[in-house]
Amino acid sequence: MEQHELFDVTVIGGGPAGLYSTFYSGLREMKTKVIEYQPELGGKIHVYPEKMIWDVGGLTPITGAKLMEQLVEQALTFSPTVVLNEKVESITRNEEGIFVLNGSSGELHYSKSVIVAIGSGILNPQKLEIEGAERFEVTNLHYTVKSFKQFKDKTIIISGGGNSAVDWANELEPIAKKVYLTYRKEELGGHGQEAQATKLLESSVECFFQSSITKLIANGERDEIATVELTNHETGEVSCLVVDDVVISHGYEQDATLLENSELSIERVDNYYIAGNATSESSIEGLYAAGDILTYEGKINLIAGAFQDAANAVNKAKQFIQPDAAKVAMVSSHNEMFKKRNKELVKQLVGK
């Protein structure tokens, strides 16, 4: 019989929920693997590396990039196996009750338990549906804002009206020469962003509602966008704006193929989210979920909430593979696993 390396738990997804699941499973002395589709860990935080995050308990305002750096460092504490550039395409279960994860590389991953932490899915931004638009992606057509500095003193148009579009417009307004925003609806969208929307509408950002980008006109000398054509869907009026950069914020496609292709009958909500409970259990014994992919009554869709989901998922996974295990891990301040590490940290502090 062919032997395969078997893990106690495999975490699918390397965002905040997946990273904390990875750390906490190491804390519970579980042999852990984390699989991430992107070439690096961090998840959706890569979309807003310079955005300030205020709502993580115990942390003063921190940039997305810094939080991501710290989450990754924490996740690697107990030396888990990390697999990057791998998409888990389906989950099955063999005759021995072991989960078999089918990777896009052709590799099969074997695990006693699984934690699904794929958030809103693989990050595939919805592209601008204009013929030839893709050729500008190497110059001045952007689907995320990774550095505000690159837009300093430039004229920018942002297409979109959701949370990210509004946030980017507000962040860029003080440093850019001019910011335009075009949105296909009558008013800004987003959830819980009323204050940010009001701030934008009262700023120098010039908004074009019920309008969309219908044409990108290139610079004759260089292969980059020089002018954007906007069309008002109500009046049919066409206007042209001279710009330096175009930012598209039309959301992300939800890739539900992992759950759709799996032979396991995982109960879902809205044909995507995993239906679970407050202790991160799914309808499949041994398979748990954490973060935005998990839904239950009273769910908190915050990074802080993802951490609680992760700890619950790991605790349940631990008891699933070892029924006599403690329900929860020993708190870090009294945990013997950190004794040696704490001594080293104290030495470093005293040395300073």
Question: Model-predicted segments: where are they?
Answer:
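FAD-binding core/adjacent interface of flavoenzyme oxidoreductases
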Residues: 1-12, 27-28, 40, 81-154, ...
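Short, well-ordered coil/turn residues at beta-beta hairpins
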Residues: 13, 117-119, 159, 249-250, ...
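Beta1-alpha1 glycine-rich phosphate/pyrophosphate-binding loop at the start
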Residues: 7-80, 166-191
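FAD-site-proximal beta/loop scaffold in flavoenzymes
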Residues: 129, 133-152, 245, 249-304, ...
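A Rossmann-like FAD-binding core segment of flavoenzymes
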Residues: 75-103, 108-111, 173-272, 325-332
